[in-house]
Amino acid sequence: MSEPVIKSLLDTDMYKITMHAAVFTNFPDVTVTYKYTNRSSQLTFNKEAINWLKEQFSYLGNLRFTEEEIEYLKQEIPYLPSAYIKYISSSNYKLHPEEQISFTSEEIEGKPTHYKLKILVSGSWKDTILYEIPLLSLISEAYFKFVDIDWDYENQLEQAEKKAETLFDNGIRFSEFGTRRRRSLKAQDLIMQGIMKAVNGNPDRNKSLLLGTSNILFAKKYGVKPIGTVAHEWVMGVASISEDYLHANKNAMDCWINTFGAKNAGLALTDTFGTDDFLKSFRPPYSDAYVGVRQDSGDPVEYTKKISHHYHDVLKLPKFSKIICYSDSLNVEKAITYSHAAKENGMLATFGIGTNFTNDFRKKSEPQVKSEPLNIVIKLLEVNGNHAIKISDNLGKNMGDPATVKRVKEELGYTERSWSGDNEAHRWT
C-alpha cells in the first residue's frame, strides 16, 4: 500500500472553497458530472501509475476538515457564510470516492502498455466540487512517479528563488498558482521554500509583491495569504442550470455577490463565453464591486487593450483604478511583457503563475531538453442533465458538447479568434 499524498482538504485552490460555499448556498440540490481531459494526449500512462492512482483516490475518503483548519478558514476567508462553515465542520462531511468517481483506463491501439485514463466524477455539485484539484495533482504526480522518471529535484528551490527574485526586481506582484499541475507535492513545497527565500532576501520590498498562493495548505504553512478568484466552473454551472446563456455572466455575478457581499466580489473571470459577451453585462454595480478581471485565454496584449477601453472609455473610470490578473500559461518573461502592456494601458497588473513554478523540470539524461508537463483539466460535463460548455477567448480551450458550443456561439454572436500562443498539446514547451 502506498502512503497518501493528499493529507488535508486544504491542499486545494482557495477558489474551490469559495465556489463550494456559493454552490452550497445557492444550488444545494443540483447534480453534476465532471470529465477529465488530457489535452497533451501524446503523454500516456502505464499500469503502475493507474494502480497507484486508484489507491490515492480511495484515500481521499478518509479526509475531514480539522477544527484548526476550520478556524484558519474563518480567519482568512471571513466572508464564508456561517451555514457553510457549519456544514463542512460536521464530522459527517467527507468525500465518497468509491461512489462518486468512475475511473477506468483504455489501452491505446498499437501501443501495448500505454493507457489513456477515463475519469468521471458524479453526484450533487456540493458533494463533488472539491475533487478537481486533488485528482489533477495526483494524476500529474502519478505520471512523473511511474512514466516519465527521467528527472530529479536538483536546483528546484534555487530555480524558484531566482524566478521570484527576477519578478520582484521588475516590481511584479504575483501569486503562486501551481497546485493542479504540480510535478508532486514535494515539488510545490520546494517552490514555496524558494519563493519565501526570495521574499526574505529583501522583505521590505518583496513582502508586498508576493500576494500569496492559491494553495490554502501552503498559505497556512508559509504564513502568506491564500489567494483565489473564481473558476469557469461557476459560470458554466450557473449557465447550464438555467440554459440562459444571454444572461449567464450577470446571473453568475448576482449569485456570487449575494453570497459574499459586494466588497468581497474579488476578480471577475471574463472569458467563459468570450470576453466580448461578458463586457455587455460588466457595468455598474458589477464593474464597481469587482476590483478587476482575470485574463485566462486568448492574446493577453489585445485583451489588455480591450479591458482598458471598457474601463476608461466606456465606463469612464480613472486610470490605474482597476486590476488585470494574468493567469494563462505564464512564465517570468511573459509576466514582465504583460506588466508593461498593462502600464501602457492604465491598468494595475497582478499575475498568477502556476505550472512554470511547480512543473518546470529538465530531463536528467539531457539537461538541455525540457521534461514536458501534462496539460490536464477536469471540467463540468453536465449540470442537472444539461450540457455544460466553455467557449473562452481562443479555439483550443473550447470545452463540451460541440452542438451546444455552436448553438451558444450563434446565440451570443461570438467571434472566432485564434492566436500564436494557442497550442494546448505542448502548452509549456
Swiss-Prot record:
5-phospho-alpha-D-ribose 1-diphosphate binds at T355. It catalyses: nicotinate + 5-phospho-alpha-D-ribose 1-diphosphate + ATP + H2O = nicotinate beta-D-ribonucleotide + ADP + phosphate + diphosphate. This is Nicotinate phosphoribosyltransferase. Its EC number is 6.3.4.21. One of its GO terms (molecular function) is nicotinate phosphoribosyltransferase activity. NCBIfam families: NAPRTase (TIGR01514). GO terms for cellular component: chromosome, telomeric region; cytosol; nucleus. Pathway: Cofactor biosynthesis; NAD(+) biosynthesis; nicotinate D-ribonucleotide from nicotinate: step 1/1. The modification Phosphohistidine is found at H232. Transiently phosphorylated on a His residue during the reaction cycle. Phosphorylation strongly increases the affinity for substrates and increases the rate of nicotinate D-ribonucleotide production. Dephosphorylation regenerates the low-affinity form of the enzyme, leading to product release. It is found in: Cytoplasm; Nucleus.
